[in-house]
From Swiss-Prot:
It comes from Synechocystis sp. (strain ATCC 27184 / PCC 6803 / Kazusa). This is Uncharacterized protein slr0889. Pfam families: ABC1 (PF03109). Coiled coil: none annotated. Disulfide bonds: none annotated. GO terms for molecular function: ATP binding; protein kinase activity. Belongs to the protein kinase superfamily. ADCK protein kinase family.
C-alpha cells in the first residue's frame, strides 16, 4: 500500500474535517493509502463534510447531484439541496479588486456600484450597478484566491481517484476519468468568460425560435467589453423568482389559472427547443433561476451550468421516452445499451426484467400523469445497478427536467 503525496496545509484541513465527522474510510485512504471498496457515510454526513470542506467540494457535491447513475436517490436528494453558506466578502475587498483588475476604469464606467451584494455564493458574489450610460447592470465578481484553492483540491481529488481506481468500484466507473470530468467542470465555472459565452449562446438560440414568442422569454445581455475571467457584467433584469411572483401584476384580463398555463407552456416550449432541437440547454432551471419580470415576461438567469446533447443522443432519448410510454421493456433495455458509453458483458434478461418492474407503475396512467423526470431518474438507476456507464450529459438532462417540474 502507499499513501497520498503531501499537499501541505490543505491536506491537513481535509483530514481534520474527515476525522471530526467520522469518515474513517476516506481518512485511511488519505493518511495511509488503505484501499478497499468505498464506504460512503450517510447523505446527511456527506453533505455536512462537503460544506465544511469549502467551495470546491460544495461544487463537487452539486455536480454529483446530477449523476443518479452513480449514487442512490437518497444521496441525490441530499446533494441537490446542498448550498454554500459562504458569507459575502466585505465591500472594501470587492472595491479594491475592482479598482485593481476591472477591464476599464471604474469612474469612467459606472455612476455607482451598490456596496451590499444581492447574492453571494462559493465562487463569487453579485452587485447591482449603474453604468455611465444610465443602464442598470449586475456585476458578478469572483472571490479572490478561489483559483488556488480549487487547484489544490483538484490535485487531491486526482490522487484519491488513482487510489480508488484499484477497487472494483473505481474500475466499473472509470473513476480517474470521472474525477477529471468533475474537476474540469468546476474549473470551467471559475472562468466567467465561459459563463458569458453560455449566456450569449442561449440568448442567441432562443431569440430566433419559432417554438414560442421570443419576446416573452429573456436571457440577460452580456456586456463583453466589461467582462473577463474574473468579472461578468450582465443586463439587470427587474423581477422575482417565479414561485414568489404576484401573477396579478401587471394587470390584465387573464386570471391566475390562465397565466400559470401560459407560463408552463412557454417553459415547456423553450426547453423542448433547448433539449431536442438545439442540444444545448440551461441545466439548472430551478425556480430561483426563473424570474417573473415586472412587465410580465419570464427570464432565465445564472447560465453557468449547461448541458449538451448530440443528435444521436437526442434521437435515442426520444425513442426511450416513446418506449416507456408504450410500456415496452425490451425496447427500453435495448436503448439503454445503445446509450451506454462502454459495454462489457450485459445480462440483457436482467435488464429487461428491471424495466418490466419499473413500468408496472405506469400501466394505468395517462400520458399527462407521467412524471418524466422520475422516469429518466429510474432509467439512470437501472443503468447504475446493471453497471452500465451512461454519458454525464444524461444526469444534467434529468436534473433539468426535475427542476422544470419544480418550477411549473
Amino acid at each position: 500500500m502507499f499513501a497520498l503525496p503531501q499537499a501541505g496545509d490543505r491536506r491537513g484541513e481535509i483530514i481534520k474535517v474527515l476525522l471530526s465527522n467520522g469518515w474513517d474510510y476516506m481518512n485511511g485512504l488519505l493518511t495511509l493509502g488503505k484501499v478497499g471498496e468505498p464506504q460512503i457515510p450517510t447523505p446527511e454526513v456527506l453533505t455536512k463534510i462537503l460544506v465544511e470542506l469549502g467551495p470546491f467540494y460544495i461544487k463537487l457535491g452539486q455536480l454529483l447531484s446530477t449523476r443518479p447513475d452513480l449514487l442512490p436517490p437518497r444521496y441525490i436528494n441530499a446533494l441537490t439541496a446542498l448550498q454554500s453558506n459562504v458569507p459575502p466578502l466585505p465591500w472594501s475587498a470587492i472595491e479594491d479588486l475592482l479598482q485593481r483588475e476591472f477591464p476599464q476604469p471604474l469612474g469612467e464606467t459606472f455612476q455607482e456600484i451598490e456596496s451590499e451584494p444581492i447574492a453571494a455564493g462559493s465562487i463569487g458574489q453579485i452587485h447591482r450597478a449603474v453604468l455611465q450610460s444610465g443602464e442598470t447592470v449586475a456585476i458578478k465578481v469572483k472571490r479572490p484566491g478561489i483559483d488556488v484553492i480549487v487547484e489544490q483540491d483538484s490535485l487531491l481529488i486526482k490522487d484519491v481517484a488513482e487510489l480508488l481506481a484499484l477497487t472494483e468500484f473505481g474500475q466499473n466507473y472509470d473513476i480517474v476519468k470521472l474525477a477529471d470530468e468533475f474537476t474540469q467542470t468546476v474549473k470551467a465555472e471559475l472562468n466567467f468568460d465561459t459563463e458569458a459565452a453560455y449566456t450569449n449562446n442561449l440568448r442567441t438560440n432562443l431569440a430566433k425560435t419559432t417554438w414560442f414568442d421570443p419576446n416573452q422569454l429573456v436571457i440577460p445581455k452580456v456586456y463583453w467589453e466589461l467582462t473577463n475571467q474574473k468579472f461578468l457584467v450582465l443586463e439587470w433584469l427587474d423581477g422575482v423568482p417565479i414561485l414568489t411572483a404576484d401573477l396579478t401584476q401587471p394587470p390584465s384580463d387573464k386570471d391566475i389559472a390562465e397565466k400559470k398555463k401560459e407560463i408552463t407552456t412557454l417553459l415547456f416550449r423553450a426547453f423542448f427547443q433547448q433539449l431536442y432541437v438545439d442540444g444545448f440547454f440551461h441545466a439548472d432551471p430551478h425556480p430561483g433561476n426563473i424570474f417573473y419580470l415586472a412587465d410580465g415576461r419570464l427570464a432565465l438567469i445564472d447560465c453557468g451550468m449547461v448541458g449538451r446533447l448530440d443528435p444521436r443522443t437526442r434521437q435515442l432519448l426520444t425513442e426511450m421516452l416513446l418506449a416507456i410510454v408504450d410500456l415496452d421493456a425490451k425496447r427500453c433495455a435495448q436503448l439503454t445499451v445503445e446509450l451506454s458509453e462502454s459495454v462489457g458483458r450485459v445480462n440483457f434478461q436482467r435488464l429487461e426484467v428491471d424495466y418490466e418492474r419499473m413500468l408496472r407503475k405506469y400501466y394505468d396512467l395517462s400520458l399527462s400523469e407521467f412524471n418524466f423526470s422520475e422516469v429518466v431518474y429510474e432509467f439512470l438507476r437501472i443503468a447504475r445497478v446493471n453497471k452500465l456507464k451512461v454519458p454525464a450529459c444524461l444526469g444534467l438532462y434529468a436534473k433539468c427536467l426535475a427542476n422544470l417540474e419544480g418550477a411549473g
